[in-house]
A protein has these predicted regions:
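Metal-dependent nuclease catalytic cores that hydrolyze phosphodiester bonds in DNA/RNA
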Residues: 1-107, 114-118, 128
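Metal-dependent nuclease catalytic regions and adjoining charged, substrate-binding loops involved
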Residues: 2-8, 88, 120-121, 136-163
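A short beta-strand motif that forms part of the nucleic acid-binding face
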Residues: 110-114, 151-153
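Short, conserved loop/turn and helix-capping segments at secondary-structure boundaries
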Residues: 123-127
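Short amphipathic alpha-helical face segments that pack within enzyme cores
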Residues: 128-135
Length: 163
């Protein structure tokens, strides 16, 4: 490994914190994850372009996520494009939306397609990514029992409990 944190010439640098999105890709396909995150091989497709377009609104930072100790039970939270990290967990994630009220918060992750007709209404990689977002919120002191996957094409919100 080189002194600048890279594996070798032509490879992507090793991140200090593991992005939740990288874990999503690994759960979906370990080989594809390696090609994308280690080899740096990635090409846009019509699906990824659609996904980028679907995220335009949520990628615009709006609203503020108050520190957990300042989030009062009667305060409504609606904050977009929030980045959270934890050295203890070794994770970093960009949360599309964090909603909250009555002292609890809930991450909402946007997906471009329609809700899949699978048990639980969500694919496993998305479930894992959302669980990591919940863990990060808890690590920052928030009360969080799960999240929501919002499917843009079908305009459906699917709750995902996290123990």
């Amino acid at each position: 490994m080189g002194s600048n944190g890279t594996i070798s010439e032509g490879h992507a640098p090793i991140p200090e914190l593991l992005p939740a999105r990288m874990v999503n890709e690994y759960v979906y396909c370990p080989r594809l994850s390696y090609l994308m995150w280690v080899q740096g091989e990635w090409a846009a497709s019509s699906d990824t372009v659609e996904g980028t377009n679907a995220h335009r609104r949520v990628d615009q930072r709006k609203g503020k996520l108050p520190k957990a100790e300042h989030a009062e039970a009667d305060t409504r939270i609606h904050a977009r494009s929030i980045t959270l990290s934890s050295e203890g967990l070794g994770l970093i994630a960009k949360l599309d939306l964090v909603e909250g009220e009555e002292g609890r918060v809930c991450p909402v992750d946007y997906k471009r397609g329609k809700r899949p007709h699978v048990e639980g209404g969500v694919w496993e990689p998305e479930r894992v990514q959302l669980a990591l977002q919940v863990l990060l919120l808890r690590e920052h002191g928030y009360s969080c029992t799960g999240g929501i996957i919002y499917f843009v094409a079908s305009k459906e919100r699917v709750p995902v409990p996290v123990d």
